[in-house]
Amino acid sequence: MTRRIPFSVVTKPTGAACNLDCQYCFFLSKELLYDAGAQTMSEGTLERYVEAFLESSPDGEVTMLWQGGEPTLRGLGFFEHLMELCERYRRPAQRVRHALQTNGTLVTEEWARFFADHGFLVGVSIDGPAPLHDAYRVNRGGRGTHAMVVRGWEELARAGVETNILCTVNAANEEHGAQVYRYFRDELGARYLQFIPIVERVRAADLAQAERGWRSGTSALLYRQDGDCVTSRSTSPASYG
C-alpha cells in the first residue's frame, strides 16, 4: 500500500508576470527567464498538475497554494476550471482547500464572490496607510496603488472571504509599526497579519542599478541578489528585530 506524505507546492500560473512594478520585488526580473508567453500555465498543464498533485497527496485536507507574479492575471475562468478539476480528481476522503496571494488591485465583486463560494484563503499585500504603502508599491507608470488595493480588500470583506495581510517591513514603514498595526486592525478590520522583512542584498558594483529597482519591459541587466551591501529600501536589523 502506497504511503502518501503531505507536502506543499507553491504554484505560479502566470510565472513572474505582474501588473505592478513594486520597487523591492525580487521576482519581476524572472520574466527574462521565459520566452514570450511561455510563463502562463495552460489548462492542459493545469489538469495534469491537479491530477498528479491530488494523486500524490494523502487523504484529509489538501491545500493548493497560488501565487505570482499576480495570479489573478490568469483570469477567473482558469480558476473556475481549477474547481472543476479538483472535484473530478480528488478522492472521496480528500478535502481540497486553496490559498492565494494577490496584490489586490484586480479583485472585483465577481472575484470576491468566487473566492467566498469556494472557501479560498486570500492574502493581500499591503504595506500600511497610503503614504507608506505607495512609497514602493507602484504600478507600471510609477504611481501608488494603495487606493486600488483597498478597493479589492473591501470587496473581499463584503463577500466574507477569509483573508490575511502580507506587509513588508522596509525603510519607508519600519519606524511606523504602531501606525501600521492600528491601520490594519482599526481601519481595514484585519485579523491576521504577516510581516516580511525587505533585505535586498547586492554587491557594491551593482548597488546603483539595484537602487533604481526593477522595471518590467526594460532592458535592465540582471544582477546577483547577494553581496555585502543592501539597498536603501531595506529594513535595518534594529528596526525589524
Regions found by a protein language model. Give the residues of each.
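Conserved alpha-helical substructure of the radical SAM core
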Residues: 1-102, 106-113, 118
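Hydrophobic faces of well-ordered beta-strands that scaffold small-molecule active sites
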Residues: 9, 62-64, 98-102, 122-124, ...
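Short, flexible, mixed-charge acidic loops at enzyme active sites
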Residues: 23-24, 127, 208-210
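Conserved radical SAM core fold
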Residues: 31-32, 71-73, 104-109, 121-143, ...
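Glycine-enriched alpha-helix->loop->beta-strand junction motifs that scaffold or abut catalytic
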Residues: 116-122, 188-189
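A conserved non-catalytic segment of reverse transcriptases
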Residues: 122-123, 150-153
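Radical SAM enzyme [4Fe-4S]-AdoMet core and its adjacent flexible, acidic
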Residues: 140-147, 154, 158-241
